[in-house]
Curated annotation (Swiss-Prot):
Transmembrane segments: 39-59, 134-154, 180-200, 206-226, 245-265, 267-287, 507-527, 543-563, 579-599, 612-632, 640-660
InterPro entries: K/Na/Ca-exchanger, NaCa_Exmemb, NCX_ion-bd_dom_sf
Any one GO MF annotation of this record: calcium, potassium:sodium antiporter activity
Name of the molecule in the record: Sodium/potassium/calcium exchanger 2
Main location as per UniProt: membrane
Chain segments carrying region Disordered: 67-86, 91-122, 312-335, 394-414, 450-471
Organism listed in the record: Rattus norvegicus
NCBIfam families, per database record: calcium/sodium antiporter (TIGR00367)
One Pfam family hit: Na_Ca_ex
Classification of source organism: Eukaryota, Metazoa, Chordata, Craniata, Vertebrata
Tissue expression per record: Expressed abundantly in all regions of the brain and weakly in the eye, large intestine and adrenal tissue.
């Protein structure tokens, strides 16, 4: 057994000696580069980028629009002349009667003379004139601060509490990823929509969700294509699955928007579409296998090893089941796999896991580069590649020493598996500095992740799902970051039990409901300050939602996708960008509408806006352009695809702002 362990470790060291140190430690460097200070810098960059549509909106403001805004205040809160529907005049008036008006709206309207919907906000300590003289900078800083606060409360408290709930309920990881974890990642958008319906009395929630959808699809994919270390090849199934559901949901939303009102049954249909997606994810593996069996009728190539190795492997492992049926590869219903996911890296990590139910065996065969996004056929090809490399290295181990080692599994897999034609794919492994470390349970990852002792220790600390710590950092940069986020983290640390601590795990209901309360507070402050910024600059809340709020609430999506893209997981990055929007469209929008109709005795919700309907149509068109662009790039995420995505995103921003300001007329409006 010692001979086998030494031979295995020597093989890995010899293989990694041909790679550059940076290549062997690429996973460590990836995670270190994405610190919170860089996240703050990224948020500031997004704010700077969003000033482009703001400038367009400011230049298009005219006195006629101000007069039109005053007229709209007389006729109704978001009902502009020329946009009231031909048969809905009386209906809109009735709905307006049920909408509570803020007490200070008349004073604000007389002072500002704008067409902003006056929500139930407290009176600002700064007057409009003071804000225009520079006090608005404080509101901008506060709004950005709320973006960071929402990301922290979701990542550190809300999602871990959802993880405990899924463990208690015994929900499979696919369903949990499409439900609880999707809710955790989209909580800011959901609460923004709730605030827009019940407090702001505007379409800020719709604008935020639509803008966030476009941001996730175009900007996030563009960033992944530009910042990935290499050209990434995409597979069709995850993209086809999520885009198909998303297209159906968007078509339903466009149809429901045609009359500018949302009935209770329309909201219910959108929620039903979401539950259909959850049911599909429950049977995703079976459906994927069936579809690929129907499509792929290729020849298979039987991968074998030498007769002596095959006999030795058979003798050592005759009692084991075949590789596809190994229980340890199955993620369905595994609470341990759910708990050990990289949730500290992002709040959408478990939703990304819904790409493939067998996606958690990343470390079980060395650092397999594309393992997380592979189907069974892809995994078999990956293991065959390992076998090929081991055969080339002439790693011969005595059959008497081959007991429960990693070589058993590789040889056995090669003997049992029949594969379609494929090319060899890359295997990334980290060399071991301690040749005597044992190989545990047939898992190479235990003996290959200690290449550099200090670096491995630091990375292990980052990887572990450790509870939140308020200990003082060591270097200056981390200390500055700590002081910036301390006003957010300290109240959360005091009021919410950290369920990642074994002693606090039983208090998960307190963490769950407490996190919801904090998310509601942060979302309210974010929308309020965004309203003040828009009122000062002279733009509507809809435009704020399409630009600043959409980008701010999508920061976790962006960080997650860039991380996985830099690890070589292109399918995760693209599919998570599309899949995260399904929850927003089918829950984030219809749930507040349905609650509103129930509270107001099934009265419909008005969603009239100058450009939001056309923005939804533009979102649908942009989705088609994304598919065509990926196809034109031959299903590869390269720099050209990144620049195409950026161009489409800025085109969407400019056109949406011009439509909302009525500089352009929406050609599809009725």
């Amino acid at each position: 057994m010692d001979l086998h362990q030494s031979a295995t470790v020597r093989l890995l060291q010899e293989w990694c000696s041909h790679e550059s140190p940076s290549g062997c430690r690429r996973h460590y460097n990836t995670r270190k580069k994405l610190k919170l200070i860089r996240v703050i810098g990224l948020v500031m960059g997004l704010v700077a980028v969003s000033t482009v549509p703001f400038s367009i909106s400011a230049f298009t403001e005219t006195y006629s629009q101000n007069n039109r805004g005053e007229a709209s205040d007389v006729t109704g809160p978001r009902a502009a002349p020329g946009h009231r529907q031909r048969t809905l005049l009386d209906l809109n008036d009735k709905i307006r009667d049920y909408t509570p008006q803020p007490p200070a709206s008349q004073e604000d309207r007389s002072e500002n003379g704008t067409d902003h919907a006056q929500g139930d906000y407290p009176k600002d300590v700064f007057s409009l004139e003071e804000r225009r003289k520079g006090a608005i900078i404080l509101h901008v800083i506060g709004m950005i601060y709320m973006f960071i606060a929402l990301a922290i409360v979701c990542d550190e408290f809300f999602v871990p509490s959802l993880t405990v709930i899924t463990e208690k309920l015994g929900i499979s990881d696919d369903v949990a990823g499409a439900t609880f974890m999707a809710a955790g990642g989209s909580a800011p958008e959901l609460f923004t929509s709730l605030i827009g319906v019940f407090i702001a009395h505007s379409n800020v929630g719709i604008g935020t969700i639509v803008g966030s959808a476009v941001f996730n699809i175009l900007f996030v994919i563009g960033m992944c294509a530009l910042f990935s270390r290499e050209i990434l090849n995409l597979t069709w199934w995850p993209l086809f699955r999520d885009v198909s559901f998303y297209i159906v949901d968007l078509i339903m939303l466009i149809i429901f928007f045609l009359d500018n009102v949302i009935m209770w049954w329309e909201s219910l249909l959108l929620l039903t579409a979401y539950f259909a997606y959850v049911v599909f994810m429950k049977f995703n593996v079976q459906v994927e296998r069936w579809v690929k069996q129907m499509i792929n009728r290729n020849k298979v190539v039987k991968v074998t090893v030498s007769e002596a190795q095959a006999k030795a492997s058979t003798a050592g492992d005759k009692e084991e089941p075949t590789l596809p049926n190994k229980p340890r590869l199955q993620r369905g219903g595994s609470s341990a796999s759910l708990h050990n996911s990289l949730m500290r890296n992002s709040i959408f990590q478990l939703m990304i896991h819904t790409l493939d139910p067998l996606a958690e065996e990343l470390g079980s065969y060395g650092k397999l580069k594309y393992y997380d996004t592979m189907t069974e056929e892809g995994r078999f090809r990956e293991k065959a590649s390992i076998l090929h490399k081991i055969a080339k290295k002439k790693c011969q181990v005595d059959e008497n020493e081959r007991q429960n080692g990693a070589a058993n599994h590789v040889d056995y897999a090669a003997e049992k598996i029949e594969l379609p034609n494929s090319t060899s794919t890359e295997v990334e492994m980290t060399p071991s500095s301690e040749a005597s470390e044992p190989v545990q349970n047939g898992n190479l990852s235990h003996s290959i992740e200690a290449a550099d002792a200090p670096q491995a220790t630091e990375t292990a600390e980052e990887d572990d799902d450790q509870p939140l710590s308020l200990s003082w950092p060591s270097n200056t940069r981390k200390q500055i970051t700590f002081l910036i986020v301390l006003p957010i983290v300290f109240p959360l640390w005091i009021t919410l039990p950290d369920v990642r601590k074994p002693a606090s795990k039983k208090f998960f209901p307190i963490t769950f409901f407490g996190s919801i309360t904090w998310i509601a507070v942060f979302s309210y402050l974010m929308v309020w300050w965004a309203h003040q910024v828009g009122e000062t600059i002279g733009i509507s809340e809809e435009i704020m939602g399409l630009t600043i709020l959409a980008a701010g609430t999508s920061i976790p999506d962006l960080i997650t996708s860039v991380i996985v893209a830099r690890k070589g997981l292109g399918d995760m990055a693209v599919s998570s960008s599309v899949g995260s929007n399904i929850f927003d469209i089918t829950v984030g929008l219809p749930l507040p509408w349905l609650l509103y109709t129930i509270i107001h005795r099934f009265k419909p919700v008005t969603v009239s806006s100058n450009g939001l309907f056309c923005a939804i149509v533009l979102l649908f068109i942009m989705l088609i352009f994304v598919i065509l662009s990926i196809a034109l790039c031959k299903w590869r995420m390269n720099k050209i695809l990144g620049f195409i995505m950026f161009g489409l995103y800025f085109a969407f921003l400019v056109v949406s702002v011009l439509l909302e300001d009525k500089v352009l007329e929406c050609p599809v409006s009725i």
